[in-house]
Amino acid sequence: MVSKKLPLDLEEEILFRVPPRSLVRFRSVCREWNTLFKNKRFINKNFACGRPEIMLNTHSHIYSISVDLKDENPTIKVRDLRFDHLSCRGYHLYGICDGNFFMYSFLNGGGGVVWNPLFWRQTKWIAKAENTCGKAIGYDGSRPEKSYKIIGRSSCSWQGKVTDTYSVFEFATNAWKVTDHTRFHEKPELMDDSGRVSLNGNLYWTAYNSPHTGQYFIAMLDFSKEIEKSRKTFCVLPCKGEKSTTHTRILSIYKGDRFSVLEQSKKTREIEIWVTKDQIGNGDDGDDVVWIKFMTVSRPDFPILLSYISTSYFVDNDIHGKSFVLCCPSKRPKAAWVYIVRGDLCKKIKIDQVLCEFQSSVYVPSLITIP
């Protein structure tokens, strides 16, 4: 009996829901599938269905932690991504965009690399950038084709004026372009508060005004704007800490197209989590953002979240209910932990492979490769 072959459109409907890590192994199954997995429309559909994972970067290893929330006893799986260049060059994570990691090292002359851990042989090497500290990767989403770039920035103050030096690396030209812009000190001044996330090619982070006004914001770096107009306030946060030092705030992505923000009181350890009601579209100005309370976690034994560099989280809401997944460090013993909260369940899992300081970030694995 000859087996019947499914129509290609039905195969595609099934395959785009398969995790990309599995699809990579299927590339050699047949020529049609290999071609399909390179199709941009298919890649974007698959990315939109992706499940978040947690990336941990130590001085010698990069790990990816997947979380299985499908049953009553959630579990994790730890993978060593085996980035061979990490141990000898001192690379640190500077950003994640479309499942691709941007890492930079100041050792041995300096320089960066962009790579997708699903295609570890394909790496994009970035030349050293002069005189810039903070760097971020993103793309101009206003164009039909994504135009990826890296933006670095450093500032120097003198007699009430600030000179911002911007370094922009265009992937299309494979070169850095440096420009200087002078501005007066702004009052109130927007102060960066916590780590950064990427959405629609732009970079977002929490911030507050100095002098402090009691309000907190999401600030953004818009990769589609002229460089001197790219940094701006996006929207107001629902956070309530009277002083910036009494609470910890961490930003995350929810359902792939919305924001989630966590705020923890350092006194009571209570955690409140909000999510945006509607998706954040490309080109949105933030004026119509509506926040809704997602979850409150009141556990006296919960850790105090101090370092956003090594703390990351994501939330989910499916047929099993609302879930909160947190990765954070402990000092004694020095270790990495994953907390999973769902209803009355609070599960704490130690990551045995990590016994040192680390960076942590949430990302979605993808088939996207940055040229």
From Swiss-Prot:
<dbReference type="Pfam" id="PF00646">
    <property type="entry name" value="F-box"/>
</dbReference>
<dbReference type="InterPro" id="IPR050796">
    <property type="entry name" value="SCF_F-box_component"/>
</dbReference>
<dbReference type="InterPro" id="IPR001810">
    <property type="entry name" value="F-box_dom"/>
</dbReference>
<feature type="domain" description="F-box">
    <location>
        <begin position="1"/>
        <end position="46"/>
    </location>
</feature>
<dbReference type="InterPro" id="IPR017451">
    <property type="entry name" value="F-box-assoc_interact_dom"/>
</dbReference>
<dbReference type="InterPro" id="IPR006527">
    <property type="entry name" value="F-box-assoc_dom_typ1"/>
</dbReference>
<dbReference type="Pfam" id="PF07734">
    <property type="entry name" value="FBA_1"/>
</dbReference>
<dbReference type="InterPro" id="IPR036047">
    <property type="entry name" value="F-box-like_dom_sf"/>
</dbReference>
<protein>
    <recommendedName>
        <fullName>Putative F-box protein At1g58090</fullName>
    </recommendedName>
</protein>
